[in-house]
A protein has these predicted regions:
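Membrane-interface alpha helices of multi-pass inner-membrane proteins
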Residues: 124-125, 157, 184-199, 209-213, ...
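Transmembrane-helix motifs of polytopic, lipid-linked glycan transferases
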Residues: 92-116, 153, 355-359
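Transmembrane-helix signature of polytopic, membrane-embedded enzymes
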Residues: 10, 108-130, 148-149, 368-371
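Membrane-proximal stem/loop segments at transmembrane-domain junctions that anchor or position
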Residues: 241, 249-322
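Short hydrophobic/aromatic helix or loop-helix immediately within or flanking a transmembrane segment
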Residues: 41-46, 60-86, 99, 145, ...
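Membrane-interface anchor segments at the N-terminal boundary of transmembrane helices
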Residues: 88, 92, 99, 300-301, ...
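Short helix- or helix-capping micro-motifs
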Residues: 15-18, 124-132, 136, 156, ...
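Loop-to-helix entry region of an early transmembrane alpha helix in multi-pass inner-membrane enzymes
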Residues: 71-78, 83-103, 137, 141, ...
Length: 424
């Protein structure tokens, strides 16, 4: 085992240890959020063999609606034998997610190594192992940790698809055989489909990746990628049509999310928890359509949001500008809901990472840029602007992309000794 690999293994071990230490030693006996309760409730139904439905014995708390959710994360929780009602996140869930997070550290190292060589891999693994937002997330029964690792796996696999490479002085050009590239594309599409079933926001990665393939004159791979991804999601879409009586591609929460981010009361960042006025407006909206189910109300949310956009294009444009700002700068209204300690650890870590990440990205732009990961990050930014930015949306994809970019500064030279594989 080379020295760099030993360092990466050590970083993975440290990453697992600090995640478990935070989850079991600090974040203990914490009450569940609404999303955590819903995920755990769905997991109980799946574990009991009742399917992805809310159990009858699960109490309704607060005023939030129960939408049909993507099945990936509840299935993951069900595999951990979550069968009884709980008031806090079970320890086995925290430990399992810490292991998943450690795999994410490894994937970040792999992507960093491809982009910037062994030193870049070690630097990426070291940063990812102790980066506070990634350390915190396994302590919650939320989909971010699982989604992060699945999305990184898709970006890593798709990053090996190489059909045409440009020669550069001093570089080693590696070409993946055409048949193998098709197989890799299919595997990457399958992982993308799994990612969508964990977190539907990954749907927006599909057109970004396909457009890149077409631009690189690999239309056949783009078609294969799109078709296999949609085929991976299709069985769940068919199930939704049977259960809800209407087309629901993955989850039925898109309408209220779009309405939340495109509303005259929207502030440009954060959900309704950070905006009481918007929450009251949403309750009034539901009262006007009290005879409908959440799934039946979904298109009505879209309709009202688009109507406001058409009537007030200037106000909506200003709102988009605020969304772009808050996507980059962690100063939105939702951050005030956290303690100062959390704000310093989370937003502070992100702000420290941002400058070297921008410098590293500039260095990588003409070398072995992690294009697949960057496209995934770009699609996440797009989602934040279309809907609304929030820290939980940023952490799984944008922060790992920044870590890989920052790690490029640790490379002595631009990947001259290890060769380079272009992405997608």
């Amino acid at each position: 085992m080379t020295r760099s690999r030993r360092w990466i293994v050590a970083a993975i071990a440290v990453g697992f240890a600090v995640r478990v230490a935070f989850a079991l030693g600090y974040w203990v006996e914490q009450p569940l959020t609404h999303d955590e309760r819903e995920y755990l409730a769905l997991a109980r139904s799946i574990a009991r063999g009742d399917g992805v439905v809310y159990p009858a014995d699960e109490p309704v708390t607060g005023t939030a609606q129960r939408f049909g959710r993507a099945p990936g994360y509840p299935v993951f929780l069900a595999m951990l034998h979550v069968t009884q009602p709980v008031d806090t996140v079970p320890a086995r869930v925290k430990i399992a997610q810490s292991a998943v997070g450690a795999i994410g550290v490894w994937l970040i190292a792999l992507i960093g190594g491809r982009a910037a060589g062994p030193r870049g891999a070690v630097a990426a693994a070291g940063i990812a192992a102790v980066y506070p937002p990634l350390v915190f997330m396994p302590a919650y029964a939320l989909s971010e940790t699982l989604y992060c690792t699945v999305a990184l796996a898709a970006a890593w696999v798709l990053g090996t698809v190489t059909l045409t490479l440009s020669e550069r002085p001093g570089s080693v050009t590696v070409t993946v055989p055409n048949r193998k590239s098709v197989t890799v594309t299919v595997l990457g599409a399958g992982l993308t489909g799994i990612g969508i079933l964990v977190r539907p926001a990954m749907l927006f990665f599909v057109p970004f990746a396909a457009a890149w393939m077409v631009w690189k004159r690999e239309t056949r791979h783009a078609v294969i990628f799109v078709l296999v991804t949609l085929a991976s999601v299709a069985p769940w879409t068919v199930r939704n049509a049977r259960v809800h009586g209407r087309f629901v591609l993955v989850a039925s929460e898109g309408g209220v999310t779009f309405w939340t981010g495109n509303n005259p009361l929207a502030r440009g960042e954060g959900d309704m928890a950070a905006n009481p006025e918007l929450k009251r407006a949403e309750l009034e909206f539901r009262n006007r359509h009290a005879d409908l189910t959440p799934e039946q109300r979904e298109p009505l949310y879209y309709r009202e949001a688009f109507a406001w956009i058409r009537r007030h294009p200037a106000q909506w444009t200003a709102l988009l500008a605020r969304k772009v700002f808050y996507t980059i700068v962690p100063l939105g209204p939702s951050y005030t809901l956290h303690s100062k300690k959390y704000l310093v650890a989370s937003a502070g870590a992100y702000l420290l990472l941002l400058p070297p990440a921008l410098a590293g990205a500039w260095r990588l732009r003409r070398g072995c840029a992690p294009v697949a990961l960057w496209l995934l990050a770009a699609s996440t930014v797009f989602v934040s602007v279309v809907f609304f930015p929030q820290e939980r949306f940023r952490i799984p994809v944008i922060d790992p992309a920044l870590i890989v970019s920052a790690a490029a500064l640790a490379a002595a030279r631009s990947h001259e000794h290890t060769g380079c594989r272009s992405n997608l």
